[in-house]
């Protein structure tokens, strides 16, 4: 039992890592993950917000164009698809669903030639806060 407390040197031909080496590598990996994961999640959120802004712009433009062309506002987002102004109702990137869009209807006519009221704006159905502190459903 003379050599039990001593760390023995590696002999030629022995392979592997010591427990200390493995612990150091794991600590470095954990440190990198604590920095990388929040940055990744933030960039995913910003990307979803960019998609939301683009989808809202596209749908609002389609609503306006439909209103001018048909001389009446669409009664729902499905009208925009049926008339060919949108291929499909886009999926809300914040709710991951296409049926959560909130439309606002107006009895006020948007165009001088318009004969019937209908939807005049669309918003996300998400209740969460954006990176700028505003609620998605106010965009």
Residue ranges, per PLM feature:
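Regular, well-ordered alpha-helical segments
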Residues: 34, 42, 49, 61, ...
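Low-complexity, acidic interaction segments enriched in glycine
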Residues: 57-139
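Aliphatic-rich helix starts adjacent to a transmembrane/signal segment
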Residues: 39-56
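N-terminal leader/signal peptides at the extreme start of proteins
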Residues: 1-15
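N-terminal single-pass transmembrane signal-anchor helix
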Residues: 13-40
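A generic structural signal for short
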Residues: 8, 17, 51-52, 64-66
């Amino acid at each position: 039992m003379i050599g039990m407390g001593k760390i023995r040197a590696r002999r030629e031909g022995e392979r592997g890592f010591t427990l200390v080496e493995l612990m150091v590598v794991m600590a470095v990996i954990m440190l990198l993950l604590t920095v990388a994961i929040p940055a990744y999640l933030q960039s995913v959120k910003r990307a979803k917000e960019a998609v939301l802004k683009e989808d809202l712009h596209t749908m609002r433009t389609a609503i306006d164009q439909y209103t001018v062309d048909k001389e009446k506002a669409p009664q729902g987002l499905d009208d925009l698809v049926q008339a060919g102004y949108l291929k499909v109702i886009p999926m809300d990137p914040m709710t991951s669903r296409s049926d959560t869009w909130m439309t606002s209807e107006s009895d006020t006519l948007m165009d001088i030639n318009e004969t019937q009221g209908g939807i005049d704006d669309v918003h996300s159905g998400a209740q969460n806060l954006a990176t700028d502190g505003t609620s998605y459903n106010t965009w």
